[in-house]
């Protein structure tokens, strides 16, 4: 009788170990997929300038003259802060980014965290700035409270034709995300 009980216990132990190993392998496969094969969906930069940013405000007393630009080229000047705050409950992004009046191009600002575009502004005309933008719907589910290394990606557009320039600028920023 004792031998049968021991065989039954051995069989149960082997079954449990087999199930645990199977669960471990499944967990490893899911982790590898999540880390290496899942792709984030990037926001494409428009080829032609989008609508003018509705939350942009005029810069205070920017009386500088336009920068000189070669024919067919452009010249830009940037004013920005490297600190960005995201409030998940208000769905607001607080930042400081300006396209000074001396620039010769319109700009579109993107905030990127871990290769995911978190926000894209409308077109910023020379002489305008933004200090607060709305967080797009659904982005609050992708972020958790804490600090992130991010970047501003600045896209340039010709003022006359609205065509996107072949160059862009990437600026490292520190993003602080809060719940309230």
What do these predicted regions represent?
Residues 109-113:
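Conserved aromatic beta-strand anchor motif in extracellular beta-sandwich/beta-rich domains
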Residues 129-139:
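Exposed aromatic-hydrophobic patches
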Residues 151-159:
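Beta-strand-rich extracellular modules
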Residues 123, 134, 174-176:
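Generic structural detector for well-ordered beta-strands
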Residues 139-149:
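Short glycine/proline/serine/threonine-rich loop/turn segments at secondary-structure transition edges
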Residues 17-108, 160-180:
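Primarily secretory-pathway and cell-envelope proteins
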Residues 1-13:
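N-terminal Lys/Arg-rich, disordered targeting/topogenic segments
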Residues 117-126:
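Solvent-exposed serine/threonine-rich low-complexity stretches and specific carbohydrate-binding patches
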């Amino acid at each position: 009788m004792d031998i049968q009980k021991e065989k039954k216990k051995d069989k149960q132990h082997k079954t449990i170990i087999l199930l645990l190993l199977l669960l471990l392998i499944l967990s490893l496969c899911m982790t590898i997929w999540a880390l290496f094969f899942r792709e984030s969906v990037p926001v494409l930069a428009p080829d032609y300038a989008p609508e003018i940013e509705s939350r942009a405000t005029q810069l205070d007393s920017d009386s500088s003259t336009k920068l000189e630009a070669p024919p067919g080229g452009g010249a830009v000047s940037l004013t920005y802060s490297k600190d960005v705050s995201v409030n998940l409950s208000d769905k607001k992004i607080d930042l400081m980014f300006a396209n000074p009046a001396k620039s010769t191009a319109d700009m579109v600002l993107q905030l990127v965290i871990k290769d995911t575009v978190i926000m894209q502004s409308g077109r910023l005309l020379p002489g305008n700035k933004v200090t607060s933008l709305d967080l797009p719907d659904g982005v609050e589910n992708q972020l958790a409270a804490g600090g992130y290394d991010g970047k501003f990606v600045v896209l340039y557009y010709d003022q006359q034709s609205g065509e996107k320039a072949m160059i862009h600028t990437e600026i490292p920023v520190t993003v602080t995300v809060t719940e309230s």
